[in-house]
């Protein structure tokens, strides 16, 4: 189930994004980006709809994923 990011408390959203960035360990090319930059990248993806916050009932957990990879029912 998609959780609208706008309905998440700002501090909680910050923590979710930061945990996601730290867990992903994505390679950003030749120039390493700071944690702050990576967090802002994910925040931008949420704002423009490229990424979504998802609740998994099965795992009882929240995750951030590309909208294109989400195949659940809203």
From Swiss-Prot:
Pfam families documented for this protein: UPF0270
Coiled-coil ranges per UniProt: none
Gene3D superfamilies, per database record: YehU-like (1.10.10.610)
InterPro entries: UPF0270, YehU-like_sf
Stored HAMAP family: UPF0270
Entry's family note: Belongs to the UPF0270 family.
The protein's name: UPF0270 protein NT01EI_3666
């Amino acid at each position: 189930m998609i959780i609208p990011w706008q309905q998440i408390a700002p501090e909680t959203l910050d923590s979710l994004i930061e945990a996601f960035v730290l867990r992903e360990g994505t390679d950003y090319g030749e120039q390493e980006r700071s944690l702050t930059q990576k967090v802002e990248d994910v925040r931008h993806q949420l704002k423009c709809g490229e990424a979504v916050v998802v609740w998994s009932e099965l795992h009882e957990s929240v995750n951030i994923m590309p909208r294109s990879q989400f195949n659940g029912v809203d």
